[in-house]
């Protein structure tokens, strides 16, 4: 018996079956650098409009986490896919380098030493810290296979960037939008600074809940309420007892009904709808409602503060609700936005007598020196002592906490710098831009940011810290009046731009060189000045990146095509960027905003140290390779929260292996093919043209998915193409033709041509996601076949020949696929019975009606080869024997399966009745004999 296996054209390739990604990926990164693959990618075949994706800067603090990886990989997929579609697109990564987290870390490192160091020395340490971590993060991002201008990123701490940020402040000043005033803002007593809404997180917190009576000695009580003022009180409810010392009024709703409830000789005013529940809370045994009045009737009555001998008038406010409490709201204008607005309306004092640590000043009787949370029990104790505490309890509720130190924050009125939302119509313009000028992806993002902008207060842009861009203004030391002049401020900005460390100039330079000569305070005539010590909100820093980067870098153009970050940035970077741009340019800085969800564990829980369910990107890279992380990003709909677990990663590894093995098989069948051997698509065998049609339509679906940012569709389309359309169908059929036919025969070259085009489509579609693997596959394409492009990322759509079938021809092939599926079903019981083993042992007879037979004939397919059997006979439906399989899916089809006649060819394993046509090869079929004797 001859060893005919050696005569078969089995797949040959050096492309390894085992990916060995953890070792191979670093080698590929070096290769990309050596070949300048990134530059080649964006400069090759740039025939369409450029696409600008502007990077939201991550914070230069700590190692990257999976949220960073998700974000950067999505951006990389977009940049690569846009370039490969002919849209030149560069990626300019950035880092947010200023702000509280870095300053905190530096304070911890410096300890007591910080108190003796000048501001610029502390800032120098902050700069070093930020530089250290941006270098660490840069390496980690590059390891993910993300391409970009890594050697020329934008940093918010460079002189040029700091000057650009300060310049935007001056623009707002020129428009009259910048104001300095005393308003309640979020305040962190631990960090001793104002906080933006985006810097506040909500966590469960247990607070004291108290009901307090305010005596109403006003003589008009007798007339309006019909009660003795000496026995009448108005009742409030609060969960912040520490604000009671700062109470200035009690607010009621003008349209609500308020009851005067008598109990045990005393009269209490509260909302009629809540009277019964309050009476139960207070333990009143026999309450009686003696009168009801509207809230409007109560306006102007004067209550007495429950602790101090001062007045607390009754005022009206539409924000009062009946959801809980008493319908009468304790009002402290120094500790709440609505309270503040009510205070302005009624001329109440904006009273907030505490220092930056949140401790009451010495002027506050009974509570001096206590911080707000220490004061809570003391206030309750004092109220009880004075007989004004009606009830107390504990309540667990969602409460604002500092994003950095995780401590509860307070609302506190302090003198801060604001950008007015009403001056120059900023709110109205921003809302109009949200509706008309931006594509929000997903669409729900539009309503989210719209409601935030619609309801937000003025933008507090000042922070009481060191590490940031200073607010360019002076303070009169005599009267605390602020002064700035836009021409003077613009001159300071240029100093920042030309200073080696940017706005360190403000902190290093002597005051005499900052203050204009002879400057006199316009308010008091004072001549002694101090620099403003506050710095700009870091959200103003990053929010002006459009001015520092998008408008300045030659790789970019304003407005950017896209901003892309996590969904929390509707109140963060998207928000501040929108206000900064609309406020100075009149238009948003972006045409589209795309958001992704958070990374959660396999059960949908947030990653948490306390749960211990966190996974670092490096762990996954070390175990599986970055390619699996990239595949994970593309496998899920990132617009929702994205799950990750060992089980999910294991499934992805299996899917990756199937895609890789498909690529390897395709490569293996190209080893003896050159570009000159490729046949025109129109001359290919019908099955090969159908396979190309399948691959081309998959390619178009993939490209549409890239355009629509639906990368999960890319993953599923590619996986299904490899597993179902190729491995389980086309390549399975093709084996006989590729292995057994004459090497240079037309039928084999037809198959190889199709395999080549399918592989080229596949690696094009893979490259934005499976970048390492696509490049590796491309490098293993035989040199005689490989295009001139140095990198897979230089391949373009223009290089693809037309490969789609006419619709009518495709319909015939789809009918064939349906028949093939029925043949497989019909064969199952015959194989189970042992009558035949391998499908090649079978003789299939198709009994079909004329219409179905005509469709199969129209395909021109070799049915024997396509069904992977040894013989196929087609007969009229009427001739079908009674025992023939009847298709439930296709009308007009019955199938008989029998053992193939003849003997099995030793070379191709197909059964033939014509074995032994050559005495030299007596065990071969005529086709195999012809191949060997040619």
Curated annotation (Swiss-Prot):
Q: Which SUPFAM superfamilies match?
A: Anticodon-binding domain of a subclass of class I aminoacyl-tRNA synthetases, Nucleotidylyl transferase, ValRS/IleRS/LeuRS editing domain
Q: Find motif ('HIGH' region) and give its ranges.
A: 58-68
Give the Enzyme Commission number: 6.1.1.5
Q: Which PROSITE patterns match?
A: AA_TRNA_LIGASE_I
Q: Which UniProt keywords apply?
A: Aminoacyl-tRNA synthetase, ATP-binding, Cytoplasm, Ligase, Metal-binding, Nucleotide-binding, Protein biosynthesis, Zinc
**Primary location recorded for the protein, binned into one broad class:** cytoplasm
Record text on cofactor binding: Binds 1 zinc ion per subunit.
Report the subcellular localization. Answer: Cytoplasm
Q: Which cofactor does it need?
A: Zn(2+)
Stored Pfam families: Anticodon_1, tRNA-synt_1, zf-FPG_IleRS
Which biological processes are named by the entry's GO terms? isoleucyl-tRNA aminoacylation
Q: Which sites bind L-isoleucyl-5'-AMP? A: 565
Question: Which superkingdom does the taxonomy of this entry point to?
Answer: Bacteria
Query: Which reaction is recorded as catalysed by this protein?
Result: tRNA(Ile) + L-isoleucine + ATP = L-isoleucyl-tRNA(Ile) + AMP + diphosphate
**Matches recorded under HAMAP family:** Ile_tRNA_synth_type1
Domain comment, in the record's words?
IleRS has two distinct active sites: one for aminoacylation and one for editing. The misactivated valine is translocated from the active site to the editing site, which sterically excludes the correctly activated isoleucine. The single editing site contains two valyl binding pockets, one specific for each substrate (Val-AMP or Val-tRNA(Ile)).
Family statement drawn from the similarity comment of this UniProt entry: Belongs to the class-I aminoacyl-tRNA synthetase family. IleS type 1 subfamily.
Official protein name in the record: Isoleucine--tRNA ligase
* Biological source species: Oleidesulfovibrio alaskensis (strain ATCC BAA-1058 / DSM 17464 / G20) (Desulfovibrio alaskensis)
């Amino acid at each position: 018996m001859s060893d005919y296996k050696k005569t078969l054209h089995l797949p040959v390739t050096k492309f390894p079956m085992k990916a060995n990604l953890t070792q191979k990926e670093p080698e590929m990164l070096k290769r990309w650098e050596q070949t300048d693959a990134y530059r080649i990618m964006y400069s090759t075949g740039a025939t369409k409009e450029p696409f600008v994706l502007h990077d939201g800067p991550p914070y230069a603090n700590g190692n990257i986490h999976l949220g960073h990886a998700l974000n950067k990989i999505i951006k990389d997929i977009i940049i690569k896919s846009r370039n490969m579609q002919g849209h030149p697109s560069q990626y300019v990564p950035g880092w947010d380098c200023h702000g509280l987290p870095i300053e905190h870390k530096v304070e911890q490192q410096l300890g007591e030493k910080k108190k003796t160091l000048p501001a610029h020395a502390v800032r120098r340490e902050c700069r070093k810290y930020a530089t250290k971590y941006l270098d660490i993060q840069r390496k980690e991002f590059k390891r993910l296979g993300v391409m970009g201008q890594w050697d020329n990123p934008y940093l918010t701490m460079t002189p040029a960037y700091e000057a650009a940020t300060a310049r935007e402040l001056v623009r707002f000043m020129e428009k009259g939008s910048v104001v300095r005033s005393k308003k309640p803002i979020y305040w962190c007593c631990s960090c001793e600074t104002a906080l933006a809404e985006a810097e506040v997180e909500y966590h469960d917190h247990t607070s004291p809940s108290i009901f307090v009576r305010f005596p109403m000695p006003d003589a008009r009580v007798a007339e309006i309420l019909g009660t003795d003022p000496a026995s009448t009180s108005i009742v409030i409810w609060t969960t912040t007892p520490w604000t009671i010392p700062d109470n200035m009024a009690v607010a009621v709703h003008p349209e609500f009904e308020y009851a005067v409830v008598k109990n045990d000789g005393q009269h209490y005013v509260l909302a009629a709808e809540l009277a019964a529940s309050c009476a139960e809370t207070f333990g009143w045994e026999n309450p009686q409602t003696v009168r009801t009045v509207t809230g409007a009737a109560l306006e102007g009555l004067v209550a007495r503060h429950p602790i101090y001998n001062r007045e607390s008038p009754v005022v009206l406010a539409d924000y009062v609700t009946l959801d809980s409490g008493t319908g009468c709201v304790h009002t402290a204008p120094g500790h709440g936005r609505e309270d503040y607005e009510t205070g302005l309306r009624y001329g109440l004092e904006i009273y907030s007598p505490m220092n930056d640590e949140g401790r009451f000043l010495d002027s506050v009787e009974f509570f001096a020196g206590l911080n707000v949370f220490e004061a809570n029990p003391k206030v309750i104790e004092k109220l009880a002592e004075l007989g004004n505490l009606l009830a107390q309890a504990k309540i667990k509720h969602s409460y604002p906490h500092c994003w950095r130190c995780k401590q509860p924050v307070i609302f506190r009125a302090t003198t801060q710098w604001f950008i007015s939302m009403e001056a120059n119509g900023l709110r109205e313009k921003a809302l109009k831009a949200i509706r008309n000028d931006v594509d929000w992806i997903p669409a729900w993002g539009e309503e989210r940011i719209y409601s935030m902008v619609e309801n937000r207060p003025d933008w507090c842009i000042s922070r009481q810290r060191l590490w940031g861009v200073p607010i360019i203004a002076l303070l009169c030391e005599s009267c605390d009046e602020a002064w700035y002049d836009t021409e003077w401020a613009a001159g300071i900005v240029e100093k920042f731009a030309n200073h080696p460390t940017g706005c360190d100039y403000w902190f290093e330079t002597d005051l005499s060189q900052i203050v204009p000569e002879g400057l006199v305070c316009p308010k008091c005539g004072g001549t002694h000045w101090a620099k403003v010590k506050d710095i700009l909100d870091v959200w103003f820093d990053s929010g002006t990146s459009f001015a520092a980067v998008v408008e300045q870098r030659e790789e970019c153009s304003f407005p950017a095509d896209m901003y892309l970050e996590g969904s929390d940035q509707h109140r963060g970077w998207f928000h501040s960027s929108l206000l900064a741009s609309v406020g100075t340019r009149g238009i948003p800085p972006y045409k589209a905003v795309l958001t992704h969800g958070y990374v959660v564990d396999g059960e949908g829980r947030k990653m948490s140290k306390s749960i211990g369910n966190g996974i670092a990107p490096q762990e996954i890279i070390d175990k599986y390779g970055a390619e699996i992380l990239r595949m994970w990003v593309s496998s899920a709909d990132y617009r929702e929260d994205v799950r990750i677990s060992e089980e999910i990663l294991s499934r992805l590894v299996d899917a990756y292996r199937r895609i890789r093995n498909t690529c390897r098989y395709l490569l293996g069948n190209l080893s003896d093919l050159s570009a000159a051997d490729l046949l025109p698509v129109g001359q290919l065998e019908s099955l090969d043209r159908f396979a190309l049609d399948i691959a081309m339509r998959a390619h178009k679906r993939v490209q549409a998915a890239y355009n629509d940012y639906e990368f999960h569709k890319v993953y599923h389309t590619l996986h299904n193409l490899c597993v179902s359309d190729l491995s389980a169908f086309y390549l399975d059929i093709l084996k006989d033709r590729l292995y057994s036919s004459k090497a240079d025969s037309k039928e084999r070259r037809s198959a190889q041509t199709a395999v080549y085009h399918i592989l080229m489509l596949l690696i094009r579609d893979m490259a934005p996601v499976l970048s390492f693997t696509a490049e590796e596959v491309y490098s293993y394409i035989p040199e005689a076949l490989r295009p001139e492009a140095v990198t897979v990322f230089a391949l373009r759509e223009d290089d693809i020949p037309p490969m789609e079938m006419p619709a009518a021809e495709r319909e015939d092939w789809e009918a064939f696929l349906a028949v093939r599926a029925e043949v497989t079903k019909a064969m199952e019981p015959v194989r189970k019975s042992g009558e035949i083993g391998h499908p090649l042992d079978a003789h299939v007879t198709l009994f079909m009606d004329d219409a179905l037979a005509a469709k199969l004939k129209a395909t021109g397919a070799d049915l024997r080869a396509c069904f992977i059997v040894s013989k196929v006979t087609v007969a009229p439906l009427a001739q079908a024997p009674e025992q023939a399989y009847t298709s439930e899916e296709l009308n007009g089809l019955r199938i008989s399966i029998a053992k193939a006649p003849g003997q099995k060819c030793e070379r191709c394993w197909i059964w033939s009745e014509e074995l032994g046509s050559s005495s030299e090869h007596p065990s071969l079929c005529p086709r195999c004999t012809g191949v060997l004797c040619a």
